[in-house]
Amino acid sequence: MSRVAKRPVKVPSGVEVKLDGQDVKVKGPKGELAWTVHDWVAVEQADGELRVQAQLDDRRAVALAGTTRALLNNMVTGVSQGFERKLELRGVGYRAQVQGKNLNLTLGFSHPVDYPVPEGITIEAPSQTEIVVKGADKQQVGEVAAQIRAFRPPEPYKGKGVRYADERVVLKEAKKK
């Protein structure tokens, strides 16, 4: 058995988990998430915990059991506490502001960049150079943050661009004559 899958997923109070065959639905204060578990993995619910077990005695099934446990844990954490990713804008004139369901970015292009906020995600701009992406689905939060960063990734000479708040950009030295 996978070392990750051995540990059960604790379901906190206020979070409701429904198992229907291979379909798992997790509902909590921050939202609702659904996912279909692979056929090689069995999920059991007992005593406020979710237990994951591989159906086959195969390396891939054991690996899938560990992955399933991690994804279920992310679902439970997401609907109870939520996930967030912080981005910061570095550069002269680089700005961000939220208008309704759109994120408006000024990133030094000849045109402003409008990013429509997907369903299940909330985007805040506490200041003009900060963006906070929040949501219940960890994968979707990371994907949206990566899409925003991709508009203008940090360049290696001055570090201008959109970067994650915890990202370290290693700067190159300019060419010398």
UniProtKB/Swiss-Prot annotation:
GO terms for biological process: cytoplasmic translation. The keyword Membrane does not apply. Coiled coil: none annotated. SUPFAM superfamilies: Ribosomal protein L6. InterPro entries: Ribosomal_uL6-like, Ribosomal_uL6-like_a/b-dom_sf, Ribosomal_uL6_a/b-dom, Ribosomal_uL6_bac-type, Ribosomal_uL6_CS. One of its GO terms (cellular component) is cytosolic large ribosomal subunit. Keywords: Ribonucleoprotein, Ribosomal protein, RNA-binding, rRNA-binding. One of its GO terms (molecular function) is rRNA binding. PANTHER family: 60S/50S RIBOSOMAL PROTEIN L6/L9, LARGE RIBOSOMAL SUBUNIT PROTEIN UL6M. Belongs to the universal ribosomal protein uL6 family. HAMAP family: Ribosomal_uL6_B (MF_01365_B). This protein binds to the 23S rRNA, and is important in its secondary structure. It is located near the subunit interface in the base of the L7/L12 stalk, and near the tRNA binding site of the peptidyltransferase center. Part of the 50S ribosomal subunit. This is Large ribosomal subunit protein uL6.
